[in-house]
A protein has these predicted regions:
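Thr-biased low-complexity repeat/linker tracts and other Thr-enriched repetitive architectures
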Residues: 1-210, 218, 223-225
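Conserved positions within tetratricopeptide repeat
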Residues: 8, 46, 50-53, 91, ...
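Acidic, Ser/Thr-rich low-complexity linear motifs
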Residues: 18-27, 44, 63-72, 89, ...
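Amphipathic alpha-helical protein-protein interaction segments
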Residues: 266-568, 573, 579, 584-607, ...
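Residue-level detector of buried hydrophobic side-chain packing
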Residues: 303, 333, 450, 535-537, ...
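A domain-level signal for caspase-like cysteine endopeptidase catalytic cores
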Residues: 541-543, 578-674, 713
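Catalytic cores of nucleophile-dependent amide-cleaving enzymes
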Residues: 573-584, 665-774
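An often Trp-containing, charged/polar helix-loop segment at the C-terminal end
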Residues: 757-810
């Protein structure tokens, strides 16, 4: 990578030093674009790809149409646009890629040595469009281009393997469409020849091996010939071991090999998937920005769950080891982005005392990496000149991350610091069960289980009825019922919608919560005078979209002969993304310096929303909090219908909120919340300036508070991630406030009712405070449990009004 970074720096400097009308400029731009494209292929940084497209396009634009080199530049444009299509799925990029690649071929004589390369670009783009739209004509044309590229390339040419691999991919795609066995056989032959022509340490060899393995695996599934299975697994395992290949290619190879062996040899399959899980941090290293990390991890969603399920399915392994190993995989393969930041925010007191220089540099680098890329780069370079382009920012961010790795290596080399900023082991995590068990779910096509962490160790409860297909069906039905339950139309059957909600809560009890609580011995409510037991849910993936804390048969709980069959009537529930995140939250529970302070952010009106997004009960909610909580600081949106005004520092802007967060103990937000449907890092609380400077999940990442104890997010969907590919990452506002340093956070799983939300807030703080305004934030989970349970008793038929609120954290 150092060679590639240096190539890009030299290429950029050459372009900048060359006049715009210089005849060599196009060639220099092309070289720069090629290098940027190569770095994108390795790391997946979109800024590199965008810069590569810009450079290639400019090279083509400044070159006369009859110039012999124009075809090179057009082909580069096509290749880069096709790569961007594969990242974002924008069909216009793909159509433009095909046009540019075809123009390059048409402008090239048949005996030109570069013609094969241009034909290969045409093949890749046409095959991508076939996979998107399904037009067989595109696939046939792609195959023709790939075959011509092979035919005109000498047998000893270094690029011949590329073209052969393309032939194999196109033939495999045609077999999957038409089922002609000859196509599959030819695909395997072409892929095998590509592998044989490639040196064992070449980074492209992993891709060629993967293509061979995929084709052999398809033939095995069709014919059942064991030699095909063995050869497919061998090819994929070898691909995963090519150290010079991109980590994402190696992960896909290992995952595919494990998938082929899952039914026949779950033990070996589990080992292969475990190796792939261990590579995930390299797929999305800290040096990449958040959006690139999310995209790269989203494409590998569910990998840790597959690995854990296969570990549990390996009956040849000792039973007492399987559960612990499975839990370790889920801990290391889920919530990676959160874990990266949490790992570097431990207590530095001893390090500062013994090694102040190292501690200071570690802190500087950590804070740079916690910032959004544009900010961190400016701080890192201390450059007063023009802001760098995004590709340069991305490179500089990686350099900061590389220096952080060196500093971490130095720190871990010191006596007593060997585990500094490393993920906790399963043994480390066992200590987190002292206050109550932690239940980690894994809903998977191979098998579904709950892993129970107690002070005695880790055990598992099989959940055979909790299949992904069934869970997805219930999730869709649940959220549709929630929407129907608040439908304002006169003819809406809201009672029937609430009935569907109750039915799904009962199903969630029968299939998930009840088996877990029974296994843990929580078979009923505690005896009078006894403390309610606590339990932490780490739902992971699909179950994070359903309210485990509200599972149960709520309308039957008082029926004669019926045991208390609800979670609310047996335990106090809390949530955590992982056990490591719970450990992090508990590191922030030391008493803050007295006196406590409270920040109240109230948005009874929201600029830019229809009818100003009126929340009439917010004013009442804020007034109640002012009267009850210690040293309240109120930021509130002024009423535009009256002459009421507010000083600038009293208006709830993001800047005003951030200014106060460093000093407060409790933060309460009564406002609209918005869960972003595709990029959860852009989920936000809608404050006064939400359209200009939103308070998003991403903007909270740099925040690292010392005095914070409780954040109450009285807003819609603040504990919800909507992008299904990122469910394992738990990216939402509730976890963002946990990361910022709040050990207790109250969030919501769906849209909440304004009036009832204010009532829940009032009842919660009534239970949490005394007459002297002393607040026991460590009782937050109990206070919410008692509040919701009481409201449930009043409104058992309308769970949508009381089941959304949850407690997350310590």
């Amino acid at each position: 990578m150092a060679d590639l970074d240096a190539a890009i720096d030299a290429g950029r400097e050459a372009v900048e030093a060359t006049p715009t009308d210089h005849p060599d400029r196009a060639g220099l731009l092309s070289n720069l674009g090629y290098s940027l494209g190569a770095r994108f292929a390795r790391l997946g940084v979109v800024a590199d790809l965008d810069a590569a497209i810009d450079a290639a396009r400019e090279a083509a634009d400044v070159t006369p149409t009859d110039h012999p080199n124009r075809a090179i530049y057009l082909s580069s444009v096509g290749s880069a646009l096709r790569a961007r299509f594969e990242r974002w799925g924008t069909l216009a990029d793909l159509d433009a890629a095909i046009d540019a690649s075809r123009e390059a071929v048409e402008a090239t004589p048949t005996d030109d040595p570069n013609r094969a390369m241009y034909l290969s670009s045409v093949e890749s783009a046409l095959r991508a469009r076939f996979e998107r739209l399904g037009a067989l004509a595109d696939l046939d044309a792609a195959l023709d281009a790939a075959r011509e590229a092979v035919d005109i390339t000498p047998t000893d040419h270094p690029n011949r393997a590329i073209y052969l691999s393309s032939v194999g991919s196109a033939l495999r795609a045609r077999f999957e469409r038409l089922g002609v066995v000859a196509d599959l056989d030819a695909a395997i032959d072409a892929a095998r020849e590509a592998v044989e022509l490639t040196p064992s340490d070449h980074p492209n060899r992993a891709e060629y091996l993967s293509n061979l393995g995929f084709a052999l695996g398809i033939r095995f599934e069709r014919s059942g010939v064991a030699t095909d299975l063995d050869a497919a697994v061998q090819a994929l395992v070898t691909a995963a071991e090519v150290g010079s290949a991109a980590p994402s290619v190696r992960v896909w190879a290992g995952r595919s090999a494990g998938g082929l062996l899952a039914s026949s040899d779950p033990g070996r399959a589990a080992g292969l998937l475990e190796g792939a899980v261990r590579l995930l941090p390299e797929v999305a290293p800290r040096g990449l920005d958040r959006l690139d990390q999310q995209e790269l991890l989203g494409g590998l969603a569910g990998l840790a769950g597959d690995a854990a399920a296969l570990v549990l399915a390996d009956l040849a392994a000792p039973v007492d080891e399987r559960a612990g190993r499975a839990l370790g995989l889920l801990e290391s393969g889920r919530v990676l982005l959160l874990a990266q930041v949490m790992a570097t925010r431990g207590d530095l007191t001893d390090l500062r005392a013994l090694h102040p220089d190292l501690a200071e540099r570690f802190t500087e680098l950590r804070d740079l990496l916690d910032q959004p890329p544009s900010t961190s780069v400016r701080l890192a370079t201390a450059d007063p000149g023009p802001a760098p382009d995004k590709a340069t920012e991305a490179r500089d961010r990686r350099r900061v991350a590389a220096e952080m790795d060196l500093v971490l290596e130095q720190i871990r080399g010191l006596g007593g610091y060997a585990s500094f900023a490393l993920p906790p082991t399963v043994e480390d995590l066992r200590g987190q069960a002292g206050q109550g068990p932690v239940v980690t779910f894994n809903v998977n096509d191979y098998r579904s289980d709950a892993l129970l962490l107690t002070e005695q160790g880790v055990t598992n409860v099989a959940l055979p009825d909790l299949t992904p297909t069934v869970v997805i069906d219930r999730i869709e039905a649940f959220h549709q019922a929630l929407a129907d339950s608040s439908d304002p139309a006169p003819d809406a059957d809201r009672a029937a919608a609430q009935q569907r909600v109750r039915e799904i809560l009962a199903w969630l009890w029968d299939t998930a919560a009840s088996p877990v609580l029974d296994a843990l011995g929580y078979t009923g409510p505690p005896a009078d005078g006894q403390e309610w037991p606590r339990l932490w849910w780490a739902p992971g993936g699909l179950l994070s979209l359903l309210p485990l804390h509200a599972a149960g048969h709520h309308t039957q709980r008082h029926d004669p002969g019926h045991q208390a069959r609800t979670v609310l009537d047996r335990v106090v529930s809390s949530y955590t993304p992982t056990i490591g995140a719970l450990r992090y939250a508990r590191q922030h529970t030391a008493p803050p310096p007295a006196p406590a302070q409270t920040l109240i952010v109230a948005m009874p009106y929201t600029p830019g929303l229809e009818q100003e997004g009126r929340l009439p009960a917010v004013t009442r909610e804020a007034a109640l909090l002012q009267a009850r909580l210690p040293q309240p600081i109120l930021l509130t949106e002024p009423d535009t219908d009256t002459s009421t005004t507010a000083r600038g520092d009293q208006i709830p802007t993001k800047a005003a909120v951030f200014m106060h967060l460093a000093d407060i103990t409790i933060a309460h937000f009564a406002c609209h919340g918005e869960s972003h449907p595709t990029d959860p890092s852009q989920s936000q609380l809608l404050l006064h300036d939400w359209q200009q400077d939103p308070l998003t999940v991403a903007s909270l990442t740099p925040v690292n508070l010392g005095y914070a104890r409780l954040a109450y997010l009285s807003a819609c969907s603040t504990a919800l991630t909507q992008n299904p590919q990122l469910l394992d990452e738990s990216i939402h506002l509730t976890t963002a406030f946990q990361l910022a340093g709040f050990p207790h956070v109250i969030g919501t799983l769906w849209e909440i009712n304004d009036e009832y939300s204010a009532d829940i807030t009032d009842a919660f703080y009534t239970r949490l405070t005394d007459s002297e305004k002393n607040v026991d934030t460590d009782r937050a989970a109990h206070a919410l449990h008692d509040t919701i349970r009481s409201l449930r008793d009043q409104l058992p038929l309308t769970p949508s009004l009381w089941a959304a609120h949850l407690h997350a954290g310590a």
